[in-house]
Amino acid sequence: AELTEARNLQTGTVYIAASEVALRCLLLPVLKQYRLLYPGVHIRISNHSTPQAIAALKDGAADIAVVTTPTVRSASLVETVIRPIQEAAVCSSAFPALTDRPVALSEMLDYPIISLGPDTKSFAFYSDFFTDHGLPFHPAIEAFTADQILPMVEADLGVGFVPNEFLESESRVCRIDLKEQIPERQVVLIKRKGQPLSVAARKLEHMIIDEK
């Protein structure tokens, strides 16, 4: 059996549906290690919003999905929480009034908000966050992917919300010290219930879960 498993890890393809945030905040170093261990396995990554990734998983176009909460619950899927991520409000130096003091969430409404589109769970997350504080959420600019938000903020187009991991080597934007705490999100791994993974996909699943 061990010989068969080793042989199965020399070839084959693993299909991953991943959101941009999950890719950057969790997956990339795992994939690097996986490639070092199993260079013969092909990795196919499709970049999706969370709902799109889950749809790809249900359709059989992906072996596993790695996305951020909130997710789309389904009786046919199994979800494993891997790690929390914390997001921050950011702006450029073009908005100095937001950078030198604690800022109320309501003040963000005075500036153009950059967000992902309404068909994403990120939009739903921030819509709920604003609603919970009695505020409307009407972004002025909609980005197609999460990694577009930071360049738009850098270009002085408005304010946005990005994971702390996006800011670790980023000095061209300013964190906004929000008075209200942005709720934590989770990176989760999702797979189809009752459907066995290939040896190569199962090995990657275990490596991702080991990041917990």
Model region roles, listed by residue range:
Residues 1-8:
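Alpha-helical "hinge/linker" immediately C-terminal to small N-terminal DNA-binding modules
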Residues 11-73, 142-143:
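Central regulatory/effector-binding core of bacterial HTH transcription factors
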Residues 26, 177-212:
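A late-sequence structural motif
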Residues 30-39, 106, 123-136:
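Ligand-binding cleft/hinge of the Venus flytrap
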Residues 58-66, 87, 135, 153-159:
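Alpha-to-beta junction loops
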Residues 74-113:
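Flexible hinge/capping segments at coil-to-helix
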Residues 74-85, 147-194:
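Beta-alpha-beta core module
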Residues 97-98, 112-133, 197-205, 212:
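Secondary-structure junction motif
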